[in-house]
Structure formats: C-alpha cells, structure tokens
Regions:
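Short, Arg/Lys-rich segments that mark the N-terminal edge of DNA/RNA- and chromatin-recognition modules
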Residues: 1-40, 45, 60, 66-71
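A short, charged, amphipathic alpha-helix used as a generic interaction element across diverse proteins
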Residues: 43-56
Length: 71
C-alpha cells in the first residue's frame, strides 16, 4: 500500500509526532484507536524519514497480526 507519509505527521509545540489510526481489524490488540509517537525532532526532513520507517514497521506488524488471525 502507498500512503502519503506526511499525513501521519503532526507538530506539537514545535516537535514532530507520528500519529496513525489503528485499523479496525487489529484494534483488539491496542488500548487506543491511534498510535502516537514523538519523533523527537524539529526537522521536517528527519520527521518524514522517521515516519516512513515507523509506518512501514506498523504495516508489517499489522500484516502479521492479520495472518495469525487467519490460522
């Protein structure tokens, strides 16, 4: 899947955060309906790089959860 990675980036008090909704089919594994992580940077370029990495890891993790559910 291809997403606009910048749509997962928010700025709070000058620091970038990654915020992404948890898909409905894996929500039972989470306490919240969103994943929110401070990227600990004030650089937009660094934030985009980090957000892409986190987003890919989440996609892979969620894919694994979906595969386990099929068993």
């Amino acid at each position: 899947m291809t997403y606009n990675q910048s749509s997962y980036i928010r700025v709070r008090f000058g620091v970038y955060h990654f915020v992404r909704r948890v898909p409905a089919d894996v929500k039972q594994h989470y306490r919240s309906d969103r994943v929110s992580i401070s990227l600990r940077t004030k650089s937009a370029k660094a934030a985009i790089r980090s957000a892409q990495s986190i987003s890919q890891r989440l996609d892979d993790y969620w894919h694994g959860l979906r595969l386990q559910k099929m068993d």
